[in-house]
Amino acid sequence: MNHLYSKTNLEEMLEAGVHFGHQSHKWNPRMAPYIFSERKGVHIIDLIQTSNLLHEACDFLANAASNKKEFLLVGTKFQASDLIKSEALKSRCHYVNQRWLGGMLTNWMTIETRIQRLKNLETQEKLGAFHHLPKKDAAHLKRQLNQLQKYLGGMKYMKNLPDVVIIVDQQKEIIAVQECRVLGIPIIALVDTNCDPEIVDIPIPANDDARSSIRWILSKLTAAIRDNRF
């Protein structure tokens, strides 16, 4: 990493608030190697470590993208939801940004049938089929369509299990983490000072609550994917 890039990188991270962890009494001791100091009862993340691990993650994603791998972005907390969707769309990735439904990966065959149902309902609506049904039936199908779009819309074009999963807020998305571990799917995750870095493949120590921090990290990860797709 050249010195100028490293300096700019650190300045950008400071500006985005990437270094602010949680209150020190909420920490996970396994995050100790990634903590720089404590200030006014709040842990400060070591941004040199963040930078190094972010580079490792970007290299991994760039290589995966060049080999035509598929990616799933997961982040359902309100600070991350719209950022997950916009970054996923820009980089042609799949995403979950509303709620992780148990079994989304480990019960993939069932999820596949729900995705097919979503596509069928979208086709019916587009063709105007709902207009030919009794109002009650049409309203029921419309509600069903809205629900499926809300929870599965970001996975609509996912034909198989993803090759890599990127997660914002490991604690909130712990079920997604567990499913990936069961299936052996590599996980890249933002890990705040209250997280366990040992249960993901590439942990990126970072503030996972501030939108500015989430946006900054996500933009780097998805750029690595976008710039290396063919």
Curated annotation (Swiss-Prot):
SUPFAM superfamilies this protein is in? Ribosomal protein S2 (SSF52313)
* Coiled-coil positions: none
Q: What is its main location?
A: plastid
GO molecular function: any one?
Answer: structural constituent of ribosome
Q: Which InterPro entries does the UniProt entry name for this protein? A: Ribosomal_uS2, Ribosomal_uS2_bac/mit/plastid, Ribosomal_uS2_CS, Ribosomal_uS2_flav_dom_sf
Q: Mind listing the UniProt keywords for this protein, alphabetically?
A: Chloroplast, Plastid, Ribonucleoprotein, Ribosomal protein
Gene Ontology BP, a term: translation
Say which family it is in: Belongs to the universal ribosomal protein uS2 family.
Kindly give the HAMAP family that the UniProt entry links to this protein. Ribosomal_uS2_B
**This chain belongs to which protein, by name?**
Small ribosomal subunit protein uS2c
Q: Which organism is it from?
A: Chara vulgaris (Common stonewort)
